[in-house]
Curated annotation (Swiss-Prot):
Gene Ontology terms: cellular component: plasma membrane
Chain ranges on the Extracellular side, renumbered to this chain: 22-485
Gene Ontology MF term list: ATP binding; GTP binding; guanylate cyclase activity; peptide receptor activity; protein kinase activity
Lineage: Eukaryota, Metazoa, Ecdysozoa, Nematoda, Chromadorea
Family membership noted in the UniProt record: Belongs to the adenylyl cyclase class-4/guanylyl cyclase family.
Positions annotated with a glycan in the UniProt record: N40, N194, N252, N351, N377, N386, N438
Gene3D superfamilies the UniProt entry points to: 3.40.50.2300, Nucleotide cyclase, Transferase(Phosphotransferase) domain 1
Tissues and organs where the protein is expressed, per its UniProt entry: Expression is biased toward ASE right (ASER) sensory neuron.
UniProt enzyme class: lyase
Domain Guanylate cyclase: 891-1021
Protein kinase domain: residues covered: 533-833
Designated name of the protein: Receptor-type guanylate cyclase gcy-4
Signal peptide: 1-21
Catalyzed reactions per annotation: GTP = 3',5'-cyclic GMP + diphosphate
Amino acid sequence: MRQLNYYIFISTILTYNLTHGQGPRPVIRVGITAALKTENGSIGWAYTGGAVPLALQYLKSHGYMLNFDFEFHVEYTECDLANTVRAGLNFMKTNNYDVIIGPPCAPALKMMGTLSTIYKKPVLGWGFVSESEISDMNRFPFVASVLPSTKTLGVVTSKLLEIYGWDRVALLYFKNELDYCSSVVNDVEKSLYNESKSVQIVMKAEIDGSNSESTSATLQVVKTRARVILFCAHAGGEKRFYLIQAGLLGMNSSEYVHVMLSMRSVGFGVQTSVGKKPLTLSGLPPIWESFTVNPDGMEDLAKSVAAKMIVIDTSSEVRDKTFLQYMTKNIVYAIREPPLSCKVPECLITNATGMGAYARHLFDVFYMYGMAVSSLNSTDPNVYGNLSLLIPKFTTAFEGMTGEVKLNEDLARKPLYQVYGLNSEYDQISLIDISLINDTVNVVFNYADGNTEVWHFWGGTRPPDTPVCGFLGKSCPLPIFEQYRALVIVAIAVTILILLAIIICMSSKIRNRRVEQSRLHSEWQIHAIKLRLPMHRRASKSSQESETESASETENFTSKSGDTMTSEFKETYTIQYLENDLVLTTAHQVQELSQAEMMKFVKLRKLDHENLNKFIGLSIDGSRFVSVWKMCSRGSLQDIISKGSFSMDYFFMFCMIRDIAEGLHYIHKSFLRHHGNLRSATCLVNDSWQVKLADFGLQFLQDEEEKPFKKNMLWAAPEVIRGSLSIEQMDSSADIYSFAIVASEILTKREAWDLSRRKEGYEEIKYAVKKGGQFVLRPDLHIDIEVNQTLLALVKDCWCENPEERPSAENVCKVLFDMTPNTEDNLMDHVFSMLEEYTSSLEVEVGERTKELTLEKKKSDILLGRMLPKQVAERLKAGQAVEPESFDLVTVFFSDLVKFTDLASKCSPFQVVNLLNDVFSNFDSIIEKHDVYKVESIGDGFLCVSGLPNRNGMEHIRQIVGMSLCFMEFCRNFRIPHLPRERVELRVGINSGPCVAGVVGLSMPRYCLFGDTVNTASRMESNGKPSMIHMSEAAHSLLVNNYPYQFETNSRGEVIIKGKGVMETYWLLGKMSLSNQSTPPITKVNHKPRKIASFTDSELTNYSFRSVSPYVENLSDNDDEEIRRVLRREMMRVEV
């Protein structure tokens, strides 16, 4: 491209003001590197260069630079690095200019900044120069810019997402020749990963502003993944293009939030001289207007999307809006006039309108320099380019055309961001001010009620990042009226239609089933009836014989796989019989199978390799799909490693690692292309200690399943953990990473990542692997035996952070083949020699296991005694059946913590558990003091009974009543540590009557109660009141008849009880003192003597002896003489 340059001199250079007797005025020489034909709408010199003379005019109108003249030299480098170097040398070395206005693009400015460190010349930055590297004072100490770093934009974006609770976002950006938005988005993405652990970028895509079809396709994908969309556009046309495309796809509903990322201080505005009604805050026309000669009629559509948009931008509040409008209209004319007098064709376009996006930044950076030089008040030419003198002046705040401008010590603009929205009049308003001071984020809210001032276009509610009805809108239930409206309107007609539909559907279903069954009779389909558990192998045998044979049939597997298997293996696989062979089965959820998926089963069954576990088939005619695999009797590799009792030397480890690599290589060459779930739990070991890979090729059956083991992610590659790949998108490199983790387990003889010895937990490890970075986290390779160092290097290469740098499975196999030890023994011979050594230590281990078994038996006996009555537990241990037992009269107790749900809502889960533990532990202590059996506790409820399993005559009613009063006394005194003002209240129900008790179930047997007595006791509790003991009439009669004058009760009256009708019930108020007892008449006719020998000393002390004189005369001869003497003496003392 032809290089253009020219010199412009102000006419007053080297002139003398003879009137005032002054010498020639100082001349400041300014070198300008501009772009004439690059990004005209943003940094094009014809649309931005006029900002320099306008800034000079503005300076002089405010009393600055009155005694200075300027010499301008412009070179059009077009952001080319070579041209930039040539221009920089010309400015700094050859002509020794005072100050350089740098190129308006980051790579070229960094080159110019490098030259400035050599020649010590200040460089002023504007345009696309927000990259974080430019603000590095160590690299570019002479570069000053009026734009903040894009790194700060990322921090502000992360803070906004945190404020509004959005964790799931999409990230879109427009591409242009300078890759401005690409650099912005990259810095924002890094900040989101560093600042927030919860934000997930579900999609990151580039938008072509010239291709509406590709943009529409991209937005269609966004609609299925996100509702909060972050996007970056560098020009006003791109912003309006995005709004129109989003509106055409219906993304202007209340579900969507569009967040525009900007650093140009324009907010919702566009820098142009054409416009209808400018925005009040920025003085710029809104982005939804059409600025072409022939409007496209899309203003309303774009406006509807803009209403659902918020903007993160540097402060755009311009104080002098009059001059801004003047600048917008005259900038293209100012460049044609002195002092610049641009005469190139681009500057002389007669119909040119509008102002470049970064013209205001060019204005501010030159205005900042002019103020700094003026404030020095010196005519010494050496100070004009002395940055050490200018820096203190640069850091002085001033009001420019981009709002308030103030530079920090790094000569980058102190970021003052504002979150903009639109009010009900579609005028721009500032919602939030966010500033960064010393790495501290300061947030100032400019609204009082977010629902009315922020989210009014969203229906007054902040939209979530995930819609209630799902991203496809299929999760919302239909309203009941819509479901049954046809039945209400045409009931008779619908009935007839239903009958016809049933007949048609049944006929069609029968026909389709026959066709489907005939089509599915293939080699991979296994009928569910052919699969059976080992204990049901022969139904003709007796139960005891069947159990004996089942034990012998599975003895081989148990002895080889070990006494214990991991819970994951038990959850994943079930051992069953297929005909007469043991197989491994895995259950899957039922789903519709396509023709392609069924053909995949045929291909899976044909896969045959010595290091792949054979896929036998799939059962699809049961309640769940069941995949059937060949039996590997030694269990999984995870079982062998976790057990830790089998010694593995280097040859053994090497053979296992080689087997895994060979199996993985075969899968990668097959139609599967990847395993997708390689872990030590999916590496099975057969009789010959040969490792076989399993659980491959069926991921599409597991997509809808809940994964019970979250620690499976410990084997997943970083790109998989980040969620950027679906199962279909995974490739072989992710398997290579998982292979490295499994190999580390084998070499270290410890489970993945050795969590028991690491200070990091699962979540910390997962986050560190997901985050990546320069220093990545990987398992430790602490090996206690001598191994080939090449093998360790291979493992480290396989878990490389970059998937492209990981070796392929084929290369791994080649390296392992070259490392094969020189020995003629095979693995089985090696295993036999190891077993011979192992046998010598077997006796010692058997003795230790016997001791452990005895100890565990004692523990199990204690635990069983706590779960079941002693006599029941002994019968169960002896293998005897426990027959149900009937009890004529028992007392049943039910209790419930009142409003426990409300109380639990004020506590954390750990506090709830601790609260229940404190309360129920004290309840258990109270129960131990009474002849009461605790049946069970369910949640916050208690069920107890007295009178069974040990019969105690009529004592059961007194034991239950006494225990209930103790419960109430404890609740009155109990205080919740973390909620001292809250009280625990108990509601108790008591009933007496017959009952049947017995042990129910084989797995986790429980001692259960049956009978209407239990139901009535439950009704007493549910119909009671807080801190009250509610008794049925049966319990009350039993209490007052057998223990009169010992407990105080009160009739509640008749109450309607569910399932019982009207019942008269009673309140138990407490123990009755002698002062509260009814005094019987003093008469000896038909008097029945009454004993009080059962009273305790504490009770006698608390009684008022003024009311017991009538009882003294009624004592029988059989009463304790000592009690009579004490009572008489005390009564005489009181009367005196």
